[in-house]
Amino acid sequence: MKFGVIVFPGSNCDHDAYHVISKHVGQPVDFIWHRDTDLSSYDAVIIPGGFSYGDYLRAGALARFSPVMNSVKAFAASGNLVLGICNGFQILCEAGLLPGALIRNRDLHFVCDYVNVRVENTDTPFTHELKAGSALQMPIAHAEGNYVCDDATFAELQGQGRIIFRYCDRNGETTDAANPNGSRDNIAGICNRERNVLGLMPHPERACEDLLGSSDGRELFRSLAGTLAAAA
């Protein structure tokens, strides 16, 4: 199996994702420049966090027009796995690969902190090695992480089990106090209908080593690799 990490001007978590895949998952991984369009040699693509194009206009609004994104759409449509983290989640929403939008945080401040997220669904390629209902500790770092969607979209996400992560307290309770940005229903991550595209605002790639305060994100990447290994 082989992973690709897309790099936009302004990406700053690309090396973190690369490090996790190469060191903790133990699989080959390449950086993919945003002007490149050939994804044929990859089994999974990661769109990392950062500030693509300086977040001008709004987060992800310009990155969606990069040449690589048409290839990402085709890659996902073929059933391949796409993971968007933080700015990557924003880009996936802007590109129409995930519904809804991520707007300014409720308090209009950039938030950089550790949060807890509850695993809502383990029936996905990204979460099958996680425990449903468990609370994972991961860092966040964003100014536009407030997930919004209309009522019909929310009902669909809820009804189809596509809300994958919710912000919670350390006991797994989804309280308002545990919601760092005002996201609807404490939503921290969602997937598409086919469940092969996942976007989340917390940074699992920054929670893979105890030295950094948490290794709770490691199993997400191992789930992803396990899915690919089973399909090989």
Spell out what each predicted region is.
Residues S78-G79, G159-G161, R193:
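Structured helix-beta-strand junction loops
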Residues G88:
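N-terminal Rossmann-like NAD(P)+-binding domain of SDR-like oxidoreductases, especially those catalyzing
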Residues M1-I85, C93-P99, N105-V111, R118, ...:
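N-terminal beta1-alpha1 cap of cysteine-dependent amidohydrolase-like domains
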Residues L97-R184:
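Pocket-forming structural segment of enzyme catalytic cores
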Residues F3-G4, Q137-A141, L198-M201:
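Active-site-proximal beta-strand elements of phosphoester/diester hydrolases
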Residues M1, A132-A135, N192-V197:
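Beta-strand-turn-beta hairpins that frame and shape the catalytic cleft
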Residues I187-L211:
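A glycine-centered loop/beta-turn motif at secondary-structure junctions
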Residues G10-S11, S52, G145, R170, ...:
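Short, glycine-/Ser/Thr-/acidic-enriched flexible segments
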